[in-house]
Amino acid sequence: MDMDKDRDLFGTEIKEMLRESIQRVVKGSFSSHDDDPVFYTRESYPGKTRIEELPLYPKGIPDVIRSWANLYAKTNYAPEDILVLDLETTGLGRGGTLAFMIGLGYYEGDQFWVEQIFLPDPDAEEHSFERLQELMRERSLLITFNGKSFDVPVLEARLLYHQIWLDI
């Protein structure tokens, strides 16, 4: 009896059961990576609210935010320039903390898209950054809630760990 072989087979069966369970409950799909795929969800919303057709995106960024975020170099950002980012993590520290969910929001045409990238297994972490990299190359303004003090430092640490170079 080969214990390592049995453990690998058992682990693979558990992962498959987990993937099937997730897909039954949550609308989304797994990435095409044979080894350690990540789970993606994607949903679009109209670019206007239901109350008096108010836009989700304001015409201008208030001066106090512009000053705090050092955005005076460029005065007009189009909705398509924006990428909203939020992380859900395994802890509050920077070292050893994994982002088990990367939440992304962005405008495409008259729709606001929300994507969530779930990490079903820590081994899939490197794959979880692929969509983030793609969207960050296309957009010039990153909006976060705790980005300066938490999300960006966590991302930088995890990207460095995987030797992925991304200018955040």
Would you name each region that the model predicts?
Residues A78-P79, G96-L98, M136-S140:
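Short, well-ordered loop/turn elements at secondary-structure boundaries
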Residues G93-P120:
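RNase H-like nuclease fold core
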Residues I51, G93-L98, F129, V154-L155:
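Short, conserved acidic/polar surface loops in the N-terminal third of protein domains
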Residues F112-I168:
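Conserved DEDDh/DEDDy metal-dependent 3′-5′ exonuclease domain
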Residues M1-A78:
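N-terminal accessory regions of nucleic-acid-interacting proteins
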Residues T75-Y77, G91-G96, Q163:
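Hydrophobic, well-ordered secondary-structure scaffolds
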Residues E80-T90:
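Two-metal-ion RNase H-like nuclease active-site motif
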